């Protein structure tokens, strides 16, 4: 819901988007001109317990993210389904190394690296595969991030140095 006011003035530039999915803690109405398809938790609860996934080409494009432009202008990079699965499996084997278990069913994970930044390094996919509880902060406000880290008893997180500096400089610490 935090991004609705940012998306509304841009919606006319996004003609291929047929609807928006709202993600929030509690389902409630949001006043917006955007075509909402629903709220994530409500839609999830309404789904049948079984779903027959359609076949698709593992080499087909699955996602698009943008580089930060470290060596030039930012650019879009496509990832295939196969690349995401192989990355997730490789990362999972590392995160499950004996004596090094960063993520598993008993762990709580909260990314501070946003998904648009290199898929948050792919860790959300790995956390899902390994059954970790996941906490997604929404806005990147330092005090709120610190409160979530503590209140949700986060075991594992990651971020870029700029965000880490914001968090450790927060008044809540």
Predicted segments with their positions:
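Adenylate-forming
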Residues: 1-10, 25-27, 113, 140-143, ...
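Conserved AMP-binding A3 loop
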Residues: 62-90
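Structural detector for helix-capping/boundary residues
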Residues: 40-41, 59, 81-82, 113, ...
